């Protein structure tokens, strides 16, 4: 059964890539010219290549993707194709894929969609001039982004995400943004760690008619509970 599901998942992804290719001009830097000429690296191949990239150099990744054929596109050809597609194109592909995956798996827990929100740092190429991502730590410092993600627990899929520079990250603002654009009609219960506690976040969730369970900081900390006279026992 697993291989059947994976095959169906691959079909859905390819359909989403085809859909993006049909409207690529909406997400191109130069809509009238980008992705219009026949290239060694087609639009669909470029998308598939990006999704399959691992931790190797671009040159080695290209050779692996094209089975080491002599006709494989050059590194500069890849760079040119990558520049043409705006980030919004990847955002469209992600949300289109998530939506269409619901046709394969749409499990609820007692009638509720269980959502979990958390964040994680990802190191990127060092660039001291990038004020959003450069962290002055150690001898040379480093660059990192913070990925905030909304996860559907029952269906094991990501519903949404928001990327911030680590130096200026704001997890509560990221959650508020994802909650505001959440459009699933199914009743939802959201769970999050104590980094997301705030009255503003509660207001966004209540306005969206979402139930939530958010871990709070201890009453002896500087969190919300510290302003209440609560007993220090069960």
PLM-predicted stretches and their roles:
Residues 1-234:
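Conserved, well-structured functional cores that handle cations and Mg-NTP chemistry
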């Amino acid at each position: 059964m697993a291989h059947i599901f994976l095959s169906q998942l691959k079909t859905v992804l390819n359909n989403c890539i085809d859909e993006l290719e049909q409207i690529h001009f909406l997400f191109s830097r130069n809509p009238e010219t980008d992705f219009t000429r026949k290239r060694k690296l087609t639009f669909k191949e470029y998308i598939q290549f990006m999704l399959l990239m691992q931790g190797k150099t671009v040159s080695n990744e290209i050779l692996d993707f094209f089975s080491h054929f002599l006709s494989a596109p050059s590194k500069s050809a890849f760079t040119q194709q990558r520049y043409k597609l705006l980030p919004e194109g990847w955002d469209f592909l992600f949300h289109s894929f998530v939506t269409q995956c619901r046709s394969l798996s749409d499990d609820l827990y007692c009638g509720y969609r269980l959502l979990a929100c958390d964040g994680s740092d990802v190191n990127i190429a060092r660039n001291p001039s990038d004020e959003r991502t450069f962290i002055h730590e150690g001898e040379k410092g480093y660059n990192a982004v913070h990925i905030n993600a909304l996860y559907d627990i029952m269906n094991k899929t990501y519903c949404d995400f928001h990327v911030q520079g680590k130096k200026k990250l704001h997890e509560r603002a990221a959650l508020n943004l994802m909650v505001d654009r959440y459009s699933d009609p199914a009743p939802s219960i959201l769970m999050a760690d104590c980094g997301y506690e705030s009255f503003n976040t509660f207001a966004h969730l209540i306005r969206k008619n979402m139930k939530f369970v958010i871990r709070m900081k201890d009453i002896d900390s500087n969190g919300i509970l510290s302003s209440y006279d609560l007993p220090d026992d069960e």
